[in-house]
Amino acid sequence: MDQKQIEEIVRSVMASMGQAAPAPSEAKCATTTCTTPVTSESCALDLGSAEAKAWIGVENPHRADVLTELRRSTVARVCTGRAGPRPRTQALLRFLADHSRSKDTVLKEVPEEWVKAQGLLEVRSEISDKNLYLTRPDMGRRLCAEAVEALKAQCVANPDVQVVISDGLSTDAITVNYEEILPPLMAGLKQAGLKVGTPFFVRYGRVKIEDQIGEILGAKVVILLVGERPGLGQSESLSCYAVYSPRIATTVEADRTCISNIHQGGTPPVEAAAVIVDLAKRMLEQKASGINMTR
């Protein structure tokens, strides 16, 4: 699928929702904004700001314009400079701040109030708390008994496509991107004439939990939107794992199709929704997913 096809799908989905399609994406620097890089250190600088991310720590560079262009082209830790054999103070502080932000988003919980505000049914895996979630990934792959009964009682049976949302390893990925990805995704699936299941939220879920969900509800395609493991300074990245006719006993990781890096600095959520709709349609046509699909 090329960029033109993606833009057509986005326009079609947004038109069906009565909204204007976003302008075509333009090449832009990888930092939040193209802030003019600065070289001086400041104790008062917000380490999460665009100015801090654009900071250049190399003193008296031979080609300052080259460093400026390099700094604007990536969010990687380049041009930070050294103080003898050690990193400069501001570079070290920003590293520690980014590490802290990533750690926080792993340990945070998605608020129950947020789930209720979205009108989502909430179920959970066999995990009861965050510590157990991080140490027992096997338990995060299975629904608890109460969740199984809730899905059977409250969800549409035998849908063409079942959409599931789970916190995963990043709560920010869910709460930040939800409103920009789920409405266009649901609208696009319905516009395609597909029978769409009841979307719901799984607390403490791992990727493989979608196999049990698909088996319980009899879904042809299961789409799991889950928070990615955060990187340094990037805690809002969402992934989509889609699988055709999942089964607990037989589905393996190669059967899944993954779309990752969904966030404003990567694949925009609205664009990702359009790609997922097209992916679901192709899965149903080919009756396959993962490495079994033909391009």
Swiss-Prot record:
Keywords: Bacterial microcompartment, Cobalamin, Cobalt, Lyase. InterPro entries: EutC (IPR009246), EutC_C (IPR042251). GO terms for biological process: amino acid metabolic process; ethanolamine catabolic process. GO terms for molecular function: cobalamin binding; ethanolamine ammonia-lyase activity. Its EC number is 4.3.1.7. Adenosylcob(III)alamin binds at V207, E228, C258. Its main location: other. Its cofactor is adenosylcob(III)alamin. It is found in: Bacterial microcompartment. Pathway: Amine and polyamine degradation; ethanolamine degradation. One of its GO terms (cellular component) is ethanolamine ammonia-lyase complex. Belongs to the EutC family. Catalyzes the deamination of various vicinal amino-alcohols to oxo compounds. Allows this organism to utilize ethanolamine as the sole source of nitrogen and carbon in the presence of external vitamin B12. PANTHER family: ETHANOLAMINE AMMONIA-LYASE LIGHT CHAIN, ETHANOLAMINE AMMONIA-LYASE SMALL SUBUNIT. This is Ethanolamine ammonia-lyase small subunit. The lineage of its organism: Bacteria, Pseudomonadati, Pseudomonadota, Gammaproteobacteria, Enterobacterales. The gene is eutC.
